């Protein structure tokens, strides 16, 4: 999962 804010998503996009 990955939104505009990666830190909000866990786990975050590796790239």
Curated annotation (Swiss-Prot):
Residues spanning the membrane: none
Molecular function, one GO term: toxin activity
Disulfide bonds: 1-13, 2-9, 6-12
Record has Manganese as a keyword: no
Cellular-component GO terms for this entry: extracellular region
Keyword Transmembrane helix recorded: no
Location(s) in or outside the cell: Secreted
Primary residence: secreted
Post-translational modification: Contains 3 disulfide bonds. Hydroxylated on Pro-11 only in conotoxin Fi3b.
Keywords associated with the record: Disulfide bond, Hydroxylation, Neurotoxin, Secreted, Toxin
UniProt tissue specificity: Expressed by the venom duct.
4-hydroxyproline sites (modified residues): 11
Family (UniProt): Belongs to the conotoxin M superfamily.
Function: May act as a neurotoxin.
Swiss-Prot/TrEMBL domain comment: The cysteine framework is III (CC-C-C-CC).
Protein's name in the database: Conotoxin Fi3a
